[in-house]
Amino acid sequence: MIPIVAVVGATGTGKSGLSLDIADRLRAQGRVAEIVNADAMQLYRGMDIGTAKLPEAARRDVPHHMLDVLDVTAEATVAGYQGEARRVITGILGRGAVPILVGGSGLYVSSVLFDYEFPGTDPEIRQRLERELAETGPGMLHRRLRELDPAAAQRIGAHNGRRLVRALEVVEITGPQPERASAEPRPWHPARILALTLPREELVPRLDARVSGMWADGLVDEVAGLLPAGLADGVTASRAIGYAQAARQLAGELTEEEAMEETRALTRRYARRQVSWFGRYADAVRLDARDERLLEHALDALPAARP
């Protein structure tokens, strides 16, 4: 059985480059690989610079899926992503190709790799919790979630209001989960997880340079072009790191340096959460992103890459 290859890790660790190198090596062996995006913000059309989305010319003729599938006004949901990504992967496997799942959005990755089930939604509960978030802030919601579902509270953290609302909505629908296991559930399909790592003292300068590069490459102009398309009204897209700050810069609420510094701080915080999330993958093969023989070590871990 062909396994899913998952390339995961924090922002700035080189996931896209490694996934393309693996696909190239498989192609040299007569195997076909196709890449499936697992970065929530790369789902959006037009959000390219701030998400480090690979342009077509840089994709080395490797098929890419789950990119540019949503308008900025649409809400990205893990449940919706899970169904579509699994449909795509099933098609890749049916063609005898190797699916390479690539991304840093931890819950999106886990929703594909593991046997996650997502409860439905209740608009009345959601609206009530969103009003409470607007009135009291995320701290109160996080304290309540910590009592009702400690594992979810630890996973989400105290500042992600949107995810806190969703977690509390699920608790109200399904009941409290005080003893829910924090371990990953059963695999959906055989997979080999490659987790890229970097020491924090080397990752942080990469992240800071990445933010500077986003502004230099035209992120503010990209955001200016997306605002008429409804970016400010997008439940998910409007909150994307970098995009929210660039929009506030355009509105005169932040200077350029303030917008960049806020983006740097949020990017560092997000990277810490990514490291924590992927650190829970007990079966992952940990790979040092600085290793000169990174590709060889990655291929050694992949049954699909053996001639």
UniProtKB/Swiss-Prot annotation:
UniProt xrefs under Gene3D superfamilies: 1.10.20.140, P-loop containing nucleotide triphosphate hydrolases (3.40.50.300)
E.C. designation(s):
2.5.1.75
What reaction gets catalysed by this protein?
adenosine(37) in tRNA + dimethylallyl diphosphate = N(6)-dimethylallyladenosine(37) in tRNA + diphosphate
Q: Does the keyword Nucleotide-binding feature in the UniProt annotation?
A: yes
Q: How does it assemble?
A: Monomer.
Which residues does the annotation say bind substrate? T11, G12, T13, G14, K15, S16
Chain positions of site Interaction with substrate tRNA: S105, R126
Record keywords, A-Z? ATP-binding, Magnesium, Nucleotide-binding, Transferase, tRNA processing
Source taxon at top rank: Bacteria
Instruction: List cofactor names only.
Output: Mg(2+)
What's one GO MF term for it? ATP binding
Q: What is this protein called?
A: tRNA dimethylallyltransferase
What Pfam families does this protein's entry cite?
IPPT
Mind giving the lineage of the organism this protein is from? Bacteria, Bacillati, Actinomycetota, Actinomycetes, Micrococcales
HAMAP family reported in the protein's UniProt record = IPP_trans
UniProt record, GO biological process:
tRNA modification
Q: Which residues bind ATP?
A: G9, A10, T11, G12, T13, G14, K15, S16
Spell out the family assignment given in the record's similarity comment: Belongs to the IPP transferase family.
Question: Which organism was this protein described from?
Answer: Clavibacter michiganensis subsp. michiganensis (strain NCPPB 382)
